[in-house]
Amino acid sequence: DITDTASIQKLIHNCDAIIHTAAIAATGKKSIPLIKATNALGTKLILELSVQAKLDPIIYVSSQSVLHPPPDGKYTNSCPISPNLLGAYAESKAEGEQLARNFQEQGKPIVIVWPSGIIGPDDVGVSVAANGIARLLKSPILPLPKTGGILMHDVRDLSKVLCKSLSSGLGPRRFGVFGHYLNWAETENFLNEVTGRKIRTVRLPNAVFHALGRFGDALSHLHVNFPLDLATARFMTTLVPGDDKSTRESLSLEWRPLSDSFKDTLLWLTRKGMLSKESIPAIFNSPK
C-alpha cells in the first residue's frame, strides 16, 4: 500500500535503491477519486522515506502527460511541468514530479523518467493502451481527429532504461522515453500495414471529437463504459513528437521498431482472447 507509511518503510528496509512505478493509471470520471487519493500521496511518501533512508538512486517513473503541452512543440528532457495539465491523472503525476524536482534541486539522487504511451506483450494486467488497441481493431469504424497522433514505445525498452538508471553515485538525472510519433494519417497507414487489413476510419473535426469525450464523461456518471473521455480526447488532438536522443545516447540504447512492438502486442492480445486471429491476417496468414 503506497499510501501507508509503515508498509513503505517495511518495503525499503535494507534496500540500496528503489524504482517507483506504482500508480492508478486509468481514464474516465469514475477513476478520479481513486487517482487523487493514491498517486500524489503515494509518491510523496515513497520519495520522502527513500530520501530519509539515503537510497541511491531513487527512480520516479513520471509521465509524458506531465509535460503536455510542451512549450516548444516537442517533449524533451528539459521541459517544465506544464501549467495546462489535461485530467486528474496528469495532475496527480505532476504533483509527485514537483516534489521529485524539489529533491533534485537539493542534490538528492532522484531520477525522473517520462514514458509516453507504453505497449508490448505480457502485461500483468491489461493496460489502457492495450485495451484501446483491442477495442479499435474490433470497431467497425474508427473515428479519428484532424490533428495530433500517437506517441508510443515498447515496455521492454522502458525496462532497459530503468535498469540502466540504477547506477548509484550519479546524482539527479532526467530521462525522456518518448519513442515513436505518428500523426493520424500515418497511424491509419501503419495499422493497415501491421494488421494486413483495411481499417475503416472517419476523420472528425476536433470539436466533434471533443464533444464525444464530453459525452463519455456524462455517461461515466451513469456507470456506462464509453471508450473516450474529454481529457483523452484533448490529449489525442494535441499530441506532438518528442526528442529523446539525449536519453538514448546517455544510456547507449536504441528503441525497437514500432511495428515489432505492435506485432508482439497483437499476438499477446490474441493469446489473452481479446483479439481474433482473423482480425490481424498479416500476422497469422503470412508465410511461415
Regions inferred by a protein language model and the residue ranges of each:
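A conserved pocket-lining segment of Rossmann-fold NAD(P)-dependent short-chain dehydrogenase/reductase
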Residues: G132-H153, D157, V161-S165, G169
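NAD(P)H-binding glycine-rich loop region in Rossmannoid oxidoreductase-like domains
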Residues: I2-L41, L49
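Conserved Rossmann-fold NAD(P)-dependent oxidoreductase catalytic core, especially the SDR/UDP-sugar
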Residues: L41-Y89, V111
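Conserved beta-loop-beta element that borders a ligand/cofactor-binding pocket
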Residues: Q98-D122
